Amino acid sequence: MSQSSASSIFTVSRLNQTVRELLEREMGQIWLTAEISNFSQPASGHWYFTLKDDRAQVRCAMFRNSNRRTTFRPQNGQQVLVRASITLYEPRGDYQLIAESMQPAGDGLLQQQFEQLKQQLAAEGLFDQSHKQPLPRPAKQVGVITSASGAALHDVLHVLQRRDPSLPVIIYPTSVQGVDAPLQIVRAIQLANLRAECDVLIVGRGGGSLEDLWSFNDERVARAIFNSHIPIVSAVGHETDVTIADFVADLRAPTPSAAAELVSRNQIELVRQIQGQQQRMEMAMDYYLAQRNQQFTRLEHRLQQQHPHLRLARQQTLLLKLQRRLEESAQTQIRLLSKRTERLQQRLQQVQPQGQIHRYNQRVQQQEYRLRQAVERQLNGYRQRFGIACSQLEAVSPLATLARGYSVTQTPAGALLKTTKQVQAGDKLTTRLQDGWVESEITQVTVAKKSRQKKVVT
């Protein structure tokens, strides 16, 4: 039996140890969902049980310092979500799991996915307050992204009709539950941004279970909300329901009805304010006219006390002029205020950001095209230099020399064999050929005469 064959023979204990090390190193920790059976808890406080599905099972242990953190008592037949390490019990050769944590499956698994995505997006800055857009005050047109047949749409329209009937509403119907719902919600948000006909969007649905609301915990929906140029109010479920969309949105409303309250004006309150302002204006005008009438009365009385008709006529003429000037001044002030209002409206229309956003998008696309071209040219240059270097390396490779029929022989000390003085009879040599190594033993060393080489006999 050769030396290499002897080194590959395992004992049972060595085999089990090697398999255990491979399992622990290669597999590490995993998440597993399964049904519990054969659950037991001896006096040590450790838990021993079997995890199974309809086709296979595996033994599992959960030590006391880990199971004391579990918030429920596992029962046979219960579906659980387990985080465990794979190992092998060497004395028996049984492979098993060592559980680190356990929680009920179903909502527990969804909650785990929710927390992982929440931490990821928070680390990327999608929840930062600096990215939040303010809502328009007041909104000129509202978009609603929800199911066309759901109660949420009915609630939103009912509140808007009650508070501000003149506010236009555009509905972007979409599924809010099921496998296709996240992609439909994303497309609705993108369509609303492309059409740019609304200055605020309500994205949401009515209440439901965690699975029902799961479309609003989808990463694609979260990124679509973050990338929206139109401010978005999230309105998912009830006040106690929290989704990823709530964290990314510019504003979170506890319910769809509350979202409608946030984006609309209370028209009844506005009417009351206008009526109050009108009443105060009328009172001010009455007071102003009363003061002027009193002034006219005093002047008239003074004129009557002086009696000269000519002076009275002059004073009457002056009063008429003052009255006309007063009326003209009032008309002038009204015209100036009207012109100022028109100029402010024109300035407001000129600062709409759509054109500037379009130009920025074009510049970004141009920069992206030039960057891709530059990277492609640089990569082509790298590929050419790499190919040349590989060709040069293959030309000087020792393996190429071996492929032509040559070999390399090493002494027992590992040095290259160049002369007969390096070896003696009985030494073992290692010879490298093109496709492997050959070990040989020297039986005789013959020194060549003159230019003749040593003869090595094996």
UniProtKB/Swiss-Prot annotation:
**GO CC terms in record:** cytoplasm; exodeoxyribonuclease VII complex
* Cleavable signal peptide: none
Q: Which keywords fit this entry according to its UniProt record?
A: Cytoplasm, Exonuclease, Hydrolase, Nuclease
| UniProt keyword annotation of Glycoprotein present | no
Task: Report the Pfam families cross-referenced here.
Answer: Exonuc_VII_L, tRNA_anti_2
Catalytic activity as recorded in UniProt:
Exonucleolytic cleavage in either 5'- to 3'- or 3'- to 5'-direction to yield nucleoside 5'-phosphates
Where found in the cell?
A: Cytoplasm
This enzyme's EC code(s): 3.1.11.6
An individual GO BP term: DNA catabolic process
Q: Which GO terms describe its molecular function?
A: exodeoxyribonuclease VII activity; nucleic acid binding
Which HAMAP family does UniProt cross-reference here? Exonuc_7_L
Question: What role is this protein assigned?
Answer: Bidirectionally degrades single-stranded DNA into large acid-insoluble oligonucleotides, which are then degraded further into small acid-soluble oligonucleotides.
Looking up PANTHER family in the UniProt record yields: EXODEOXYRIBONUCLEASE 7 LARGE SUBUNIT
Q: How does it assemble?
A: Heterooligomer composed of large and small subunits.
Q: What family does the Swiss-Prot or TrEMBL record give for this protein?
A: Belongs to the XseA family.
Which protein are we looking at? Exodeoxyribonuclease 7 large subunit
Chain's gene name: xseA
